[in-house]
From Swiss-Prot:
Keywords: Chaperone, Cytoplasm, Nucleus. CDD domains: DnaJ (cd06257). SMART domains: DnaJ (SM00271). Residues 3-69 form the J domain. It holds the Pfam family DnaJ. GO terms for molecular function: Hsp70 protein binding; unfolded protein binding. This is DnaJ homolog subfamily B member 6-A. One of its GO terms (cellular component) is perinuclear region of cytoplasm. One of its GO terms (biological process) is chaperone-mediated protein folding. It is found in: Cytoplasm, Perinuclear region; Nucleus. It comes from the Eukaryota.
């Protein structure tokens, strides 16, 4: 039986932040698109990691799991002690792809993984130590990703508060056999002393004939992520919270 704490590689007393960091690392490592030569195992591990995160990141589900195990969530234990569990009709796990998509707020994490880390992580107090991790062998993602594998975020001397920084990259091949053109661009203006820092990053790729563009805007501590499909806004998140979209015609 799968043990969720072991799946994420955390202790039973792990904090919510530890669980989130573990999921981020393992979901990126085992995403099937990153493991085209080991897809069966990757899909299994990716699903296990998603299940573990979905349970352990929710205090209520985690408490039930700690007391009754997975059977307490799926209501398959058969014993009377499960009758008191809040999930009387069994908890249904979401698709691992949905968990992955929700976790990253609609943006494409592989666009930022070109540099082995998200260059904007430091805005929200997260450590950049992951930038120096070596990329796993056979990680997929095409020759462009291999070219930049292990490359620190914009170079060791780059500061996210440098004034007027901009860059753009592009490649053919896509991620894990999706095909199509993938591009990434980033620009930043202002500085930490000016108090009006603004950064805009955009990634565009063609998936199944549709052009998907993800724009991330970070300004004065606020993060806004817009996802467009063929020019139509499909999702909008502000500081990780999904916003309702108005359907008014412009």
């Amino acid at each position: 039986m799968v043990e969720y704490y072991e799946v994420l590689g955390v202790q039973r007393n792990a904090s919510a932040d530890d669980i989130k960091k573990a999921y981020r690392r393992l979901a990126l490592k085992w995403h099937p698109d990153k493991n085209p030569d080991n897809k069966d195992e990757a899909e299994r591990r990716f699903k296990e990691v998603a299940e573990a995160y979905e349970v352990l990141s929710d205090s209520k589900k985690r408490d039930i799991y700690d007391k009754y195990g997975k059977e307490g969530l799926t209501n398959r234990g058969g014993g009377s002690h499960f009758d008191e569990a809040p999930f009387q009709f069994g908890f249904t796990f979401r698709s691992p792809d949905d968990v992955f998509r929700d976790f990253f707020g609609g943006r494409d994490p592989f666009s930022f993984d070109l540099f082995a880390d998200d260059p904007f992580d430091d805005f929200f107090g997260r450590s950049r130590h992951r930038a120096n991790r070596s990329r796993p062998a056979g990680g997929g993602g095409g020759p462009f990703l291999s070219t930049f594998g292990g490359f620190p975020a914009f170079g060791p001397s780059f500061s996210p508060f440098d004034s007027g920084f901009s860059s753009s990259f592009g490649s053919f091949g896509g991620h894990g056999g999706h095909g199509g053109f993938t591009s990434f661009s980033s620009s930043s203006f202002g500085g930490s002393e000016m108090g009006n820092f603004r950064s805009v990053s955009t990634s565009t790729k063609v998936v199944n004939g549709r052009r998907v563009t993800t724009k991330r805007i970070v300004e004065n501590g606020q993060e806004r992520v817009e996802v467009e499909e063929d020019g139509q806004l499909k999702s909008l998140t502000v500081n990780g919270k999904e916003q309702l979209l108005r359907l008014d015609n412009k």
